[in-house]
């Protein structure tokens, strides 16, 4: 729902003071399921997952990989009438200031979920219980890919 700056949206006749033009992913998915069906919603969310993974893979060499820090990215995605997602921009360290009560609730949940994920040391992402990952899900597990590929390789036998 969020496409332009909130300061600009607030002046529009269609501005909703309750949610400020922002929905969480659950509400977005429920809306798409109600208006287009579950299969269409599943395709849309799979396409958005792929878009996010592809964008991160495209810049992975530039992303700092340090176990002592993390980054939260904000994705602005436009969904057209055919339910095709278009990447508008990716924000490094997006604003966490809230413009409405609903926005505050959503952002506090985001912060809690991010901390649940990054503070769970010593457990591989694929082995973490989902309750410890908040509303997040693993979209791509590169470490799991490497270990699966290594396990599938034929091993040389020593003589």
Where are these regions (language model features)?
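Intrinsically disordered, low-complexity intracellular terminal segments
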Residues: 147, 153-159
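Catalytic core of tubulin tyrosine ligase-like
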Residues: 1-72, 82-85, 104, 109-146
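Glycine-rich phosphate/pyrophosphate-binding beta-alpha loops
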Residues: 91-99
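A short beta-strand motif that forms the metal-chelation/ATP-contact edge
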Residues: 77-79, 84-92
């Amino acid at each position: 729902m969020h496409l332009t700056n909130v300061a600009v949206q607030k002046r529009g006749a269609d501005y909703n003071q309750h949610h400020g033009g922002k929905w969480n992913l659950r509400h977005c998915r429920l809306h798409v399921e109600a208006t287009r069906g579950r299969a269409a919603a599943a395709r849309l969310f799979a396409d958005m997952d792929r878009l996010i993974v592809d964008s991160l893979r495209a810049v992975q060499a530039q992303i700092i990989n340090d176990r002592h820090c993390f980054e939260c990215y904000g994705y602005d995605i436009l969904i057209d009438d055919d339910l095709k997602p278009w990447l508008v921009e990716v924000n490094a360290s997006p604003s966490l200031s809230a413009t409405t009560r609903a926005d505050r609730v959503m952002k506090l949940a985001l912060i809690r979920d991010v901390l649940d994920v990054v503070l769970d040391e010593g457990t591989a992402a694929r082995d973490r219980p989902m309750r410890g990952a908040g509303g997040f899900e693993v979209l791509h597990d590169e470490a799991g890919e490497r270990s699966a590929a290594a396990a599938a390789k034929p091993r040389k036998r020593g003589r």
